Design a protein with these regions (language model features):
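Extended active-site neighborhood of metal-dependent phosphoesterases/phosphodiesterases
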Residues: 1-85, 105-119, 127-163, 167-170
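Proline-rich low-complexity regions
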Residues: 12, 93, 185-186
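Short, well-ordered beta-to-alpha junction loops that form the rim of enzyme active sites
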Residues: 55, 89-93, 124
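Short, catalytically relevant binding-site loops at active-site mouths
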Residues: 58, 93-96, 127, 176
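Short acidic, glycine-rich surface-loop motifs adjacent to enzyme active sites
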Residues: 79-97
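Active-site His/acidic residue clusters
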Residues: 98-102
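A short C-terminal boundary segment appended to hydrolase-like catalytic domains
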Residues: 160-195
Length: 195
């Protein structure tokens, strides 16, 4: 796996493929893999198991299937100690429900809640949003370079994770240096319509 090293803080950077990273080639993730490495993998940091799963589809067809990912995910989670906190990264949100079930066409499914899932971290919506779905947090962050599609300011999220997999989250805003902007909605015209 090719992880970039943030030389200032000496921290690894792990990449997660998104829909626009699936580009023309022998298979959609070919370029991504040549630069960053595999599109699904896991690692441990402290007492927490982190899982990166690929976007199911995108601008071009991937070489992997939901069956491939599901089989791999089942195998990966079968090898962690029971009760280990799990955080999953995927470019898109898996579900709006309280139960996070990864489904495949022919390889069955896996209920991630049964593996002490703490958070599902995604970015496809390009908004700053965090919601508790049952016992699991879904966490989305806007685009670093242009902000959110909901006009939220460009930011990146810092998550501090403890040994139990519980976390705090803070947004750090970019391109702002003692800057404030106050917006005031326009009033109603004498005719009663908005300008």
């Amino acid at each position: 796996m090719n992880t970039a090293l943030n030389t200032e803080k000496h921290r690894n950077v792990f990449y997660c493929i998104g829909n626009h990273d699936l580009v023309k080639g022998k298979y959609g993730e070919e370029l991504f893999e040549s630069i960053y490495g595999p599109v699904y993998y896991s690692f441990d940091a402290g007492n927490v198991h982190y899982v990166v799963t690929p976007m199911p589809g995108g601008d071009h067809a991937p070489g992997y299937t939901s069956d491939d990912v599901c089989r791999w995910l089942k195998n990966d989670l079968a090898h962690i100690r029971p009760g280990t906190p799990v955080v999953v990264f995927n470019h898109d949100l898996l579900t709006y429900e309280d139960t996070f079930i990864f489904k495949s066409k022919n390889a069955g499914s896996i209920n991630l809640n049964e593996y002490n899932l703490k958070a599902w971290v995604y970015g496809h919506w390009h908004i700053n949003y965090m919601k508790k779905q049952g016992d699991v947090y879904s966490v989305c962050t806007s685009s670093l370079d242009k902000g959110g599609i909901d006009h939220s300011t460009t930011a990146f999220r810092v998550m501090h994770v403890d040994s139990k997999g519980d976390f705090t989250s803070e947004l750090r805003y970019t391109y702002l240096d003692k800057n404030i902007c106050i917006a005031s909605p326009a009033g109603v015209m004498a005719s009663g319509v908005l300008p």
